[in-house]
């Protein structure tokens, strides 16, 4: 049989109040009533709307329906979960009013007549997982850190249909070496289970904040290094920043813009730590007096060099 998304059919959210559900039902019932509607498949849609309202208007049926979970999609193949059973008593649905209802409805709420009531007794459902995004600095990703998260959990009062939020705080540890998009699983920190079933898990997705000096690819860190023409030509020892502190780097003679130097193990830590790559970019100083212009002129005369030679064949 196919799962019926009653909230989607009525066009309301899962935390809709009883009044919102009733208002939407009345609007859609008028729209699709076969006696007045010119909509295609109006009769079928009217039955779907009627069925959805029959469940969501009733406190116990809605409570039981919600226990199935929100991970299902309209039309998806469905089988009632183990432990789903009926109990006598309470408000049922008279057979004449169930005519045309789906197999999905009948499998969950039909079959016991006017004196039937469906419950969640002995029905267990693992709590839903929650997902959150945490932005950390590159320094935090390198060193590790702790965070105090504030989480909002929806609480539904099935007697009134009102939805409130419960706030809780959770201190978490960000391990050293986390990377962009990595997920941290916190077991049992999701929404509560039903009928004694375990809680869901909380998944934290790591987002690395942009850095003023470094860019990151996986565990590797990249730094653009400005150098002077004479440092590039003659070679030099320069001090550069890394996430673990400053280190000395030797520029080989004849370094070129775009050349990449590797500092092994200076990236983000882990079982196999990343590397830091230094990208050389040569900056040409502008001559500001006649003496400096003369130096450039001497270079042009004493170092004949045509970087466009290959372009001209």
Curated annotation (Swiss-Prot):
Its main location: cytoplasm. The keyword Chaperone applies. DNA-binding protein that preferentially recognizes a curved DNA sequence. It is probably a functional analog of DnaJ; displays overlapping activities with DnaJ, but functions under different conditions, probably acting as a molecular chaperone in an adaptive response to environmental stresses other than heat shock. Lacks autonomous chaperone activity; binds native substrates and targets them for recognition by DnaK. Its activity is inhibited by the binding of CbpM. Keywords: Chaperone, Cytoplasm, DNA-binding. One of its GO terms (cellular component) is nucleoid. This is Curved DNA-binding protein. Residues 71-93 are annotated as: Disordered. Coiled coil: none annotated. It is found in: Cytoplasm, Nucleoid. PROSITE patterns: DNAJ_1, DNAJ_2. The lineage of its organism: Bacteria, Pseudomonadati, Pseudomonadota, Gammaproteobacteria, Legionellales. Residues 5-69 form the J domain. The gene is cbpA. It comes from the Bacteria. GO terms for molecular function: bent DNA binding; unfolded protein binding. Gene3D superfamilies: DnaJ domain, Urease metallochaperone UreE, N-terminal domain. It comes from Coxiella burnetii (strain RSA 493 / Nine Mile phase I). One of its GO terms (biological process) is protein refolding.
């Amino acid at each position: 049989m196919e799962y019926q998304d009653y909230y989607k059919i009525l066009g309301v959210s899962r935390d809709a109040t009883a009044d919102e559900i009733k208002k939407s039902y009345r609007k859609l019932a008028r729209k699709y009533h076969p006696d007045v509607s010119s909509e295609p498949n109006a009769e079928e849609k009217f039955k779907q709307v009627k069925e959805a309202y029959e469940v969501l208007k009733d406190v116990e049926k809605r409570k039981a329906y919600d226990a199935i979970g929100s991970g299902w999609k309209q039309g998806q193949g469905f089988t009632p979960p183990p432990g789903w059973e009926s109990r006598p008593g309470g408000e049922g649905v008279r057979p004449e009013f169930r005519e045309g209802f789906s197999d999905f409805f009948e499998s969950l709420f039909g079959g016991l007549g006017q004196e039937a009531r469906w419950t969640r007794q002995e029905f267990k459902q693992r709590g839903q997982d929650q997902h959150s995004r945490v932005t950390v600095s590159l320094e935090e990703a390198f060193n590790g850190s702790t965070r105090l998260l504030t989480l909002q959990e929806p609480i539904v009062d099935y007697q009134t249909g009102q939805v409130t939020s419960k706030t809780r705080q959770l201190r978490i540890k960000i391990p050293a070496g986390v990377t962009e998009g990595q997920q941290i699983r916190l077991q049992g920190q999701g929404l509560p289970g039903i009928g004694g079933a375990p809680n869901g898990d909380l998944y934290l997705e790591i987002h690395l904040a942009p850095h003023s000096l470094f860019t990151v690819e996986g565990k590797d860190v990249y730094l653009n290094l400005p150098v002077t023409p004479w440092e590039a030509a003659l070679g030099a020892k320069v001090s550069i920043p890394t996430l673990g502190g400053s280190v000395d780097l030797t520029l080989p003679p004849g370094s070129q813009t775009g050349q990449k130097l590797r500092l092994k193990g200076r990236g983000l830590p882990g079982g196999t730590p990343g590397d830091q790559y230094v990208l050389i970019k040569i900056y040409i100083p502008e001559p500001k007096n006649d003496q400096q212009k003369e130096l450039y002129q001497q270079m042009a005369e004493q170092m004949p060099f045509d970087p466009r030679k290959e372009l001209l064949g």
